A protein has these predicted regions:
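Catalytic domains of riboflavin
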Residues: 1-413
Length: 413
């Protein structure tokens, strides 16, 4: 054996702890893949560009600058292990299947234990816990007898037991470039230049293939037995939802986001209570990843335009302000489902062809698409829904509405 290699407790080789660990993305084991190290305690150990915590990495830098956080703080990972087992799945060992997250990111305390003992500052990029969620829409569904209290998944007063996991982005740059049909050098240059030169290593260190971008990640919510996720046998109901703070949290009625989120949760619960499993994936992509400032500017433009807020101009107003109608890049969205070992969705709560097509391109089958029920659409969101239906969004058996005659509420109403 090479003198620079050590062995873990099970005999798997690991590198000398005086070296920068090599990363072999898609390797068959964690030991062969190696840990992702983007911490700064020892720059010689870094094998990735960027730093941990996604969009919160800048707050960490501010905390260190303000001397409220020690720059050499070492995380105590005692009792932080996942509360439920996820993986490993075959997709973890395919460098083309998962390119935007670290599939071993929730298991660093286990699979990289020897690295931690020898002073490598390896951090989790995924955390898995349990929780109860409580939403008025769930209680309304119980009152309408679409969901029942079972004492297991749903309590008598309407709270729902879930397994949830938070996932920070970890990008394997060659895989990201391939997913978008780009040259890796062009991708690196674009990321470097269009962030104002924020990450010079993107262009100066082509040997570093992994990048931890300062963007939001995703949270998954699993309803029912999470051990059944990815078993290939258990029926799965799924909603992939992109963040909309105004609607999801505050109930703004200009869009259908919260209604569809609630509907996705409802069908996930129904599937779990029928012996299957339910899943909601919540991606931090506010305003179609254009951001909330841009979204509110578009709202103003829609409401102030001559003739009022109309479906015919719904996408055009976004393009006028942002230059593009959507930057969510659903090409990366299937990765979280690959992480969970999912190969088939039996009921998919989505009207978006972009989401559906992205999953199909990645080999994830969809048996049934479930549109948002018409009675869940807020009045002012009719503009959005008519525009999307005209653009080809899936509607199921719903008849077309009054596209030409639909006008949204005025700005000052």
């Amino acid at each position: 054996m090479n003198a620079n290699l050590l062995s873990t407790a099970n005999g798997s080789p690991i590198q000398s702890m005086t070296e920068r660990p090599q990363l072999v993305w898609g390797a068959p084991t964690a030991a062969e893949r190696g840990p992702v190290i983007a911490t700064l305690r020892n720059p010689d150990h870094r094998n990735a560009v960027g730093s941990h915590a996604g969009g919160y990495s800048v707050y960490r830098a501010l905390a260190i600058a303000a001397r409220t956080l020690a720059h050499d703080h070492i995380a105590d990972l005692t009792d932080t292990a996942p509360v439920e087992q996820i993986g490993p799945h075959p997709q973890w060992c395919d460098a083309r299947k998962i390119v935007s997250l670290d599939p071993w990111g929730h298991l660093v305390g286990e699979v990289f234990r020897e690295h931690l003992k020898r002073g490598y500052d390896v951090r989790p990029t995924i955390a898995v816990t349990r929780a109860h969620i409580d939403m008025p829409e769930i209680r309304a569904a119980m009152a309408a007898r679409r969901i029942r209290a079972d004492g297991d998944i749903v309590s008598a007063h309407g709270s729902v037991r879930v397994m949830k996991a938070a996932i920070d982005p970890v990008w394997y740059l060659p895989g990201i470039a391939e997913r978008f049909g780009l040259d890796e050098t062009d991708l690196r240059r674009g990321l470097h230049e269009q962030t104002g030169g924020m990450y010079p290593e993107l262009v100066s260190r082509p040997d570093l293939k992994v990048f931890l971008p300062p963007i939001g990640g995703a949270t998954i919510y699993c309803f029912g037995d999470s051990a059944k996720l990815g078993d290939g046998l258990t029926p799965l109901a799924c909603r992939v939802h992109d963040e909309c703070n105004g609607s999801d949290v505050f109930g703004s009625d200009i869009c259908t986001c919260r209604p569809y989120l609630a509907h996705g949760i409802e069908i996930a619960i129904q599937m779990a209570q029928a012996g299957g499993v339910g899943l909601v994936v919540y991606n931090r992509k506010e305003g179609r990843a254009l951001g909330e400032v841009t979204k509110f500017l578009v709202y103003n433009a829609r409401k102030r335009q001559k003739g009022g807020d109309r479906p015919a101009d719904y996408f055009a107003r976004t393009e006028c302000v942002a230059g593009v109608r959507d930057m969510r890049f659903q090409e990366l969205m299937p990765d979280v489902l690959h992480w969970l070992g999912i190969t088939r969705i039996h009921r998919f709560a989505s009207m978006s062809d972009m989401k559906c097509d992205a999953l199909l391109r990645q080999g994830i089958a969809i048996d049934e698409r479930v549109p948002l029920p018409d009675d869940m659409i807020p009045p002012d969101a009719r503009v959005e829904i008519e525009a999307k239906l005209a653009a080809g969004y899936f509607a199921g058996e719903r008849p077309r509405g009054d596209y030409a005659g639909t006008v949204g509420r005025g700005l000052h109403e």
